[in-house]
Amino acid sequence: MRKIIHIDMDCYFAAVEMRDFPEYRGKPLAVGGSRERRGVISTCSYEARKFGVRSAMATSYAFKLCPNLILVPGRMQVYKEVSLHIREIFSRYTPLIEPLSLDEAYLDVSECQQYKGSATLIAEAIRRDILAETGLTASAGIAPVKFLAKVASDLNKPNGQYVITPEMLPEFVKTLSLRKIPGVGKVTAEKLTSLGLNTCGDVQVYSKQELLSRFGKLGAVLIERAHGIDGRGISIDRERKSVGVETTLAKDIYTLEQCQQVMPGLIQELALRLSRSAKDRKIHKQVVKLKFSDFKQTTIEHRTEEVSVNLFYDLLTQALARQDARGIRLVGISVGLADSTLYVASTLNTQTQLDLAL
């Protein structure tokens, strides 16, 4: 049986700000984009959460819920530096580290000999080191499999940890909500509920053939997770799957021409990001995303092995066909990265310059 720890920093961006600026402590604080530029909340303090403020919420709505909210723009470079320090702490206990983002990671400590191999004590030690060296608190989940470690890390927040032992696993998963399983979003959860499936226990006694017929690959995953099975190991060389850029507009726009005026800046920024982080990666698709005034969004993608500026404009036109008279508040573009090594950024740079020169 493996010993997996999921470490999740507590309201990370906001916590860094409160550490560096003590005047923010104990107050409702959020990191995110401004109301004037129609930004969204990246994260917020627990004091702000008491008012209902949440990540990914429109900043304007957050202020309606909490008029005294303190909003700061964020300092990404600082967050990255602290994250590297935290990752160095992880490496003292195991080389098997899978970062999920700046503020969370999986660790496999199955072979760790410290603390007599106790994953519970190792997690406590990691959290102590993080607090002592960075001034930040972390929560942890410990379990024999990845998805349950992630679930567990959320059960004793903030600054706590929760252990699911192999002996606890069968009973724990029976009552676990299907919404906690990665890959089960709002729409899928509603479909499952319509079938009378709300917990892993419900799936355990449901027809496997019916699940596979209705949900395909996700059905197979549901069957495994409902029985506490997750064969995924720690991916220490986890590759980036995509590179993208998007902009939230100061005011809603409505026409194709207005959207097209946004594109050159996005394309230039995408070219820059590709050259920095994926210059030796081959692409397999291009994507355009629009978010409308009702906060619903649509994406259009096309499989391709060569970046084409013209294709981005074609996809934009297709996406706009789904507008239904709604205003557009966000435009985004991205490329999906394949697992090969062909230089792609210079192509985009060249095409971008040609397009902008026309």
Swiss-Prot record:
Gene3D superfamilies in alphabetical order: 3.30.70.270, 3.40.1170.60, 5' to 3' exonuclease, C-terminal subdomain, DNA polymerase, Y-family, little finger domain
Cofactor remark: Binds 2 magnesium ions per subunit.
Catalysed reactions listed for this entry: DNA(n) + a 2'-deoxyribonucleoside 5'-triphosphate = DNA(n+1) + diphosphate
Is Nucleotidyltransferase one of the keywords UniProt gives this record?
yes
Show the GO cellular component annotation of the record: cytosol
Listed A to Z, the keywords are: Cytoplasm, DNA damage, DNA repair, DNA replication, DNA-binding, DNA-directed DNA polymerase, Magnesium, Metal-binding, Mutator protein, Nucleotidyltransferase, Transferase
Which InterPro entries does this one have?
DNA/RNA_pol_sf, DNA_pol_Y-fam_lit_finger_sf, DNA_pol_Y-fam_little_finger, DNA_polymerase-Y, DNApol_IV, IMS_HHH_1, Rev_trsase/Diguanyl_cyclase, UmuC
Q: Name one Pfam family in it.
A: IMS_C
Residue intervals of the UmuC domain: 4-185
Instruction: Write down the superkingdom of origin.
Output: Bacteria
The UniProt site entry described as Substrate discrimination is assigned to 13
Q: Does the keyword DNA-binding apply?
A: yes
Instruction: Tell me which Gene Ontology terms the entry assigns under biological process.
Output: DNA-templated DNA replication; error-prone translesion synthesis; SOS response
Q: State a single Gene Ontology molecular function.
A: damaged DNA binding
Q: What does this protein do?
A: Poorly processive, error-prone DNA polymerase involved in untargeted mutagenesis. Copies undamaged DNA at stalled replication forks, which arise in vivo from mismatched or misaligned primer ends. These misaligned primers can be extended by PolIV. Exhibits no 3'-5' exonuclease (proofreading) activity. May be involved in translesional synthesis, in conjunction with the beta clamp from PolIII.
> How does this protein assemble?
Monomer.
Q: What is this protein called?
A: DNA polymerase IV
Q: Which organism is it from?
A: Shewanella sp. (strain W3-18-1)
Q: Lineage of the native species?
A: Bacteria, Pseudomonadati, Pseudomonadota, Gammaproteobacteria, Alteromonadales
